[in-house]
């Protein structure tokens, strides 16, 4: 530790404070006597004064951004997050008895991932890999990245002699393109699940008039489909088409497919045609780690994932690769990530990934994953009881894909209605849609609500809210007199209309319900305080935290 910094420590007043984001901030003051004692030069003191902004809290430095974050925190706390690709950040409860009494409490009491992601590690540049960096001063970063890689392999029970992993990708999309770059050449052929059938943009999506993503711009793409009627992947047709198309790469993975994958069958198709098999398990990686979904690792050559969905880490990506597949596979993957597709890694994010992976290996995480699936199945059951059409007639994972076309509604209209009443869903294409811009369904994901300690009984309430939202949408569409989206919005925005009155009541009911449940990462909630009281954790909450969840004007 530098002598100057060491001399300052006794004179720095450190006051941990919890802001709306529960981030620790420091209030720094320098004793003038230190300067008189010669421990601080006049230039050093002047520099500290000039850099005062570096020690301000967010609220002090930028009230405008702080207000936006405050409003967003209220939105999440007072609403129901049903976006399938969103999941609250993970938390681990220290007392073992809490895990025993309530297995989902690991989501509520620690800010470990957020703290790692907002740490000093963001300051360090570290292009390259551990032991082979292009910058100095990376001894601690090397330890961190090696730890993260070890935890990634352990989380999925992988043998380090067989599997390797790159933890540097900035996102799942970057991970996918880097994996493509490592495995195949430009204009080689790929096959992935079509976007309207539940696939992902990065798996080669294009339209009749335009190649939409880099994966279709730089590679030749021929999507496979689900079977009309059942919504299940048509493995028979995939077998036939792959035999004709001879892809160099087959991608198995989805963003809106509510069933599990037959990796063994896909392996056979890939081997028959000399194809690599890549699994993009971004949506289900947490469920795979918990043993609640089939594992792609037994059959696939490369496995990619995001880290922020059911794995519940920060926003980033991972690439797993079989080292025994080809002798240069590890080198190809690592070089595809850097320098081919990105620059220096985000070390703060890697730290957050490491924390999340440790938590994913905890037995409590398995209970969380089981509950996610149970909650999704409860939503599906209740919606089906109202005779709504669900893709594949149910779910085996964390999401439900709801087909609204039989009702004469679009996903866009339900998304608009739900936004107004603090329910967040996303419009989504369903099998048979002719345009991704006007999708006929919505995707409902249950990872985030499970992280808020909701179980099957609460899912019945949530499903009832969704049912009411659809009925209000039908009323608004009738009031609009046509099916134009702008007139639909105008109808439920008119306070004299029945749809507006029903919507206002639904909004109140949703807020009243949602604010009974803690929001992971934000301990300053009445629900969070009540949980602490219930379990008699001896913490002086009144002095440790100041409740700062505020209801913004207009809500």
What feature does the model see in each segment?
Residues 3, 8, 48-50, 57-63, ...:
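PLP-dependent enzyme catalytic core of the Aspartate aminotransferase-like
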Residues 72-79, 123-131, 247, 330-335, ...:
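Short acidic (Asp/Glu) and glycine-rich catalytic loops that position anionic groups and cofactors
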Residues 74, 87, 122, 126, ...:
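Conserved internal helical-beta-strand scaffold that buttresses enzyme catalytic cores
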Residues 147-387, 408:
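Conserved PLP-enzyme active-site core in the AAT-like
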Residues 389-457, 527-534:
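Conserved PLP-binding catalytic core of the aspartate aminotransferase-like
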